[in-house]
Curated annotation (Swiss-Prot):
The gene is Ccl4. Its main location: secreted. This is C-C motif chemokine 4. Monokine with inflammatory and chemokinetic properties. Pfam families: IL8. SUPFAM superfamilies: Interleukin 8-like chemokines (SSF54117). CDD domains: Chemokine_CC. The lineage of its organism: Eukaryota, Metazoa, Chordata, Craniata, Vertebrata. Transmembrane segments: none annotated.
Length: 92
């Protein structure tokens, strides 16, 4: 009897875990990073190594610049200098 109760408990635990994993639609990963504010200053172009755009699931769009020191800096994609840096990084 104890074995049946233990097995049933384990089955319920596994079912609860699988339900939460399978309940999300396929491909609906939560965004890995979102920006809630932008840098107030222009970054020196020499410090910027790469960039990425935040997910469309974020509350506001942003371009995240990756610096030589490994920092991630959020920038406003409507700023002219941000577009200039993105274009420059795409060409190189």
């Amino acid at each position: 009897m104890k074995l049946c109760v233990s097995a049933f408990s384990l089955l319920l635990l596994v079912a609860a875990f699988c339900d939460s994993v399978l309940s999300a639609p396929i491909g609906s990963d939560p965004p890995t990073s979102c920006c809630f504010s932008y840098t107030s200053r222009k970054i020196h172009r020499n410090f910027v190594m790469d960039y990425y755009e935040t997910s469309s699931l974020c509350s506001q769009p942003a371009v995240v610049f990756l610096t030589k020191k490994g920092r991630q800096i959020c920038a406003d994609p409507s700023e002219p200098w941000v577009n200039e840096y993105v274009n420059d990084l795409e060409l190189n």
